[in-house]
Amino acid sequence: SKVEVNLFSDKVPVIKNVKKFVTANIIPGGTLNNLDYVSEFVEFPDNFPESNKIILADAQTSGGLLISVPRLYTKKLVNELLTKGVHDTSVIGEVISKKKGKIIVY
């Protein structure tokens, strides 16, 4: 899409005990394929843990949803989702510009 996105990894909801499974090397093959596929489009900090990269690339996202809206509407959308019972709601990033076509992970 040729836009630059800042992704705030600490804001991404993660299912309980996932890190424990990743640490035990219980990782779906599709996840590693995902990570390999997106590697040219994603910039991670030099010290970013490999386990966190794997979690962000997880292929087990059945039901996962990402919505991109103008910043002006984020609070309203989050509040509306919460009132509708969508509890794992979080603003996890921002579209910065039409630059590199990259996702920059923080």
Residue ranges and their predicted role:
Residues 1-106:
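Glycine-/charge-enriched secondary-structure boundary and capping motifs
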